[in-house]
């Protein structure tokens, strides 16, 4: 049976592939942090993503007006800062917890689009799960407060990514992803150089950075920009609730990270 590319099921499939790609790659990224740090890892990831997307999307062919450029630039900046905050977070706290806290972004989008009482009940449950993860009580498992703050900052940027990503996709189509990656890479590169210096360009790091660029940015963000054109922002935010569990499983399988019972309960509250 042929599935239309405009079908909601097609868009959902793209999102699932995107989430799997991002979370498996995040485990790889954590192995690079001890070498060059989160800032340089983010910069290289975005740089390679931009290079990979250039010949595919051919953004120079897009005829954009000044008005169309604004959402693309904001999309690129939110992408860059989101990634750097997220990498700073998971360098300090478990991957699954970091993604769960970052989920405050899509959760906020879902709240803004909710109209029914049942929607607010589910959102309240998710907020309760997030409170369980905050380092304000013994159940949080002694999470690093700086890591938590970075994860929440990444969540804010994720909300901006969804908001501006939909507008960027409408303005420039597939070229928006490539242009956004260029903007994000240019914004984060100074932080990477300041943090790691020339070591970020060593041959032991570049192959890993290329893999991150493809599977953490180029592929998933390309898939997401297509999905965002077909799905309402609220639906996108709800579907992304699967991401914390995928992240936790990736952390367990690839990094040997373990979550306590309260943290698993919190994740369950968030994704329900």
Residues covered by each model-derived region:
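Membrane-interface interhelical linkers
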Residues: 1-20, 50-74, 112-121, 139-143, ...
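Hydrophobic transmembrane alpha-helices of multi-pass small-molecule transport proteins
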Residues: 104, 118-137, 154, 250, ...
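Hydrophobic/aromatic residues within transmembrane alpha-helices
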Residues: 32, 41, 45, 89, ...
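Glycine-/small-residue-enriched transmembrane alpha-helix faces in small-molecule transporters
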Residues: 1-40, 74-77, 81-85, 127-128, ...
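Helix-helix packing/entry segments at the starts of transmembrane helices
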Residues: 44, 98-101, 164-185, 217-253
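Specific alpha-helical transmembrane segments that line the substrate/conduction pathway
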Residues: 40-50, 87-117, 154, 234-252
């Amino acid at each position: 049976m042929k599935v239309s590319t405009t079908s909601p099921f097609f868009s959902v499939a793209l999102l699932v592939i995107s989430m799997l790609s991002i979370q498996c790659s995040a485990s790889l990224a954590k192995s690079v942090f001890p070498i060059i740090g989160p800032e340089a890892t983010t910069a290289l990831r975005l740089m390679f993503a931009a290079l990979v997307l250039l010949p595919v999307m051919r953004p120079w062919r897009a005829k954009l007006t000044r008005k169309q450029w604004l959402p693309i630039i904001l999309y690129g900046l939110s992408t860059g800062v989101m990634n750097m905050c997220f990498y700073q977070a998971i360098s300090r706290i478990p991957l699954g917890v970091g993604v769960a806290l970052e989920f405050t972004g899509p959760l906020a989008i879902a709240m803004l689009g909710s109209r029914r009482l049942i929607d607010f009940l589910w959102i309240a449950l998710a907020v309760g799960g997030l409170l369980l993860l905050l380092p304000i009580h013994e159940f949080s498992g002694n999470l690093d407060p700086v890591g938590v703050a970075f994860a929440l900052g990444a969540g804010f940027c994720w909300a901006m990514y969804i908001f501006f990503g939909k507008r960027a996709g409408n303005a420039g189509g597939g070229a928006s992803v490539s242009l956004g990656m260029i903007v994000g890479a240019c914004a984060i590169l100074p932080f990477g150089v300041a943090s790691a210096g020339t070591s970020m360009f060593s041959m032991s790091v570049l192959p890993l950075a290329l893999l991150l660029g493809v599977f953490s940015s180029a592929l998933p963000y390309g898939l997401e920009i297509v999905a965002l054109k077909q799905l309402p922002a609220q639906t996108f935010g709800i579907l992304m609730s699967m991401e914390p569990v995928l992240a936790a499983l990736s952390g367990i399988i690839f990094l040997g990270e373990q979550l306590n019972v309260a943290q698993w309960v919190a994740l369950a509250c968030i994704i329900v």
